[in-house]
């Protein structure tokens, strides 16, 4: 029999407790039980006046509102406030009653501009939640996985301008210059002079009058801090690069945000400085991080770099670099035709140049497979930090390393997929790097806290079940009781 009573209870008056309306296994209840949110007061105490002004909005509520937004992947703050108005669990989490007015959607933005801008508040919140994970001994930092993903910026790809920008200095530049000059002196060469041009002369190609290299970049007029990123063969967008490190259990250990046009190997140092002291034994990364500088940095710090095979960039039909054998004793290369390529110089990029004799190569039967140079001289380069790259190759072939590298898809790549699908990290509505760092920090904080809350609840449930079993078998099954105690 069909019942029609859908509209009968709409105008009923009831008395209830807010706490009774939120299920015991609701995610927000589990999160609220997992961490004491009062730590936020200590972080923002210097942002508020102690003895004058109107009473402010509770800082904990102020942080919890965007936390709800990123936890549930709500697209905007305006939509988040609308959801809070009608969602009992959201109101309970914020400490609001049913008749309390929800803060205006612009409240958080104004507080961010006036109080939290140019501070590391959101990174401190991320670190505080990460400390809770450490407290429960859930994190194993011995194996760390590093990768980067791109987040589409709030910028129209057609609204841009081109500008001349100075090439940014590499993090290893000073050390590399020193070792280049030492290497040149060992080979009887003069140290390289600093690049300085006459200011009266016009800039040379790729350079400037002050010696700094320049390049032409595309800059968004909407969000100048984002970077022009090539997404596929036929699509370019302005984006941010989010670099992340996690352990083998999927706990996020650190992050950094950079413009989307910067290569992962250039921005690695900013992330590495945040995580290098947590006890890393092995660091796993993709081919984008396979550079001599990163290999040297990790090995000098006692960390095992696990980097994949990187195919040679040789043209089809030509000998690969691996077919030229390096003789360490005589410091030379031997070509496939058993001819010597002798040391010539060490360039500014840190590469030793080994050249063949053009007169000998002119009559070589393999010339067309070797070089296209007009003088028939073959040049093979070797970085002064190449021994570190060779060490990485030895590590890659060690037993068990292939299986460890395969865990990337189960750890850091899964995190990116979860963040984009469930937490709104596929694109951003924020403009500027600082706001993007806030979004990423809170998103990763809520991902860690969500996982922590579920594990604490699951552990508590198992503990209760274990106690019930222990009571049941205490009098009747001594052997079973002993087994349970050993678990």
Provide a role label for each language-model segment.
Residues 24-67, 72-73, 384:
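Basic, short loop/linker segments at the boundary and entry of helix-turn-helix/winged-helix-like folds
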Residues 11, 24, 37, 58, ...:
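Generic alpha-helical segment signature
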Residues 4-8, 54-56, 98:
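A short, ordered amphipathic alpha-helix with a cationic face
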């Amino acid at each position: 029999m069909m019942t029609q009573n859908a509209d009968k209870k709409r105008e009923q008056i009831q008395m209830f407790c807010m706490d009774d309306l939120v299920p015991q296994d609701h995610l927000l209840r589990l999160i609220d039980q997992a961490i004491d949110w009062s730590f936020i007061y200590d972080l923002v105490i210097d942002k508020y006046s102690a003895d004058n002004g109107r009473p402010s909005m509770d800082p904990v509520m102020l942080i919890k509102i965007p936390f709800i937004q990123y936890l549930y992947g709500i697209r905007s703050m305006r939509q988040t406030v609308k959801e809070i108005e009608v969602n009992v669990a959201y109101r309970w989490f914020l400490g609001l009653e049913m008749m309390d007015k929800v803060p205006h959607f612009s409240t958080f933005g104004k507080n961010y501009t006036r109080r939290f801008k140019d501070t590391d508040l959101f990174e401190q919140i991320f670190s505080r939640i990460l400390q809770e994970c450490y407290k429960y001994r859930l994190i194993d930092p011995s194996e760390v996985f590093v990768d980067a993903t791109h987040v589409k910026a709030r910028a129209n790809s057609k609204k841009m301008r081109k500008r001349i920008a100075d090439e940014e200095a590499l993090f290893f530049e000073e050390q590399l210059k020193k070792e280049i000059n030492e290497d040149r002196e060992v080979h009887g060469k003069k140290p390289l002079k600093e690049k300085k041009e006459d200011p009266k002369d016009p800039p040379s190609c790729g350079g400037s009058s002050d010696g700094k290299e320049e390049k032409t970049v595309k800059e968004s007029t909407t969000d100048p801090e984002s970077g022009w990123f090539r997404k596929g063969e036929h699509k370019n967008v302005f984006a941010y690069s989010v670099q992340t490190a996690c352990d083998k259990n999927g706990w996020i250990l650190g992050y950094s945000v950079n413009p989307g046009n910067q290569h992962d190997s250039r921005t690695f140092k900013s992330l590495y400085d945040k995580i290098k002291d947590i006890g890393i034994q092995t660091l796993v990364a993709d081919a984008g991080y396979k550079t001599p500088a990163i290999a040297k940095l990790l090995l000098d710090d006692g960390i095992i770099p696990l980097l994949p095979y990187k195919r040679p960039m040789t043209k089809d039909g030509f000998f690969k670099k691996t077919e030229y054998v390096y003789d360490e004793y005589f410091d030379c290369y031997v070509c496939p035709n058993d001819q010597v390529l002798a040391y010539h110089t060490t360039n500014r990029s840190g590469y030793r140049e080994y050249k063949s004799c053009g007169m000998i190569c002119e009559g070589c039967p393999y010339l067309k497979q070797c070089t296209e140079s007009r003088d028939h001289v073959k040049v093979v380069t070797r970085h002064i930090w190449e021994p570190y790259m060779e060490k990485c190759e030895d590590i890659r072939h060690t037993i068990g390393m292939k299986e460890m590298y395969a865990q990337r898809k189960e750890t850091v790549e899964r995190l990116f997929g979860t963040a984009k699908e469930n937490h709104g990290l596929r694109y951003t509505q924020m403009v500027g790097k600082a706001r993007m760092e806030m979004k990423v920090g809170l998103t990763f904080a809520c991902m860690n806290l969500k996982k922590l809350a579920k594990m604490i609840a699951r552990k508590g449930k198992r503990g209760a079940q274990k106690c019930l079993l222990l009571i049941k078998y205490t009098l009747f099954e001594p052997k079973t009781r002993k087994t349970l105690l050993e678990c």
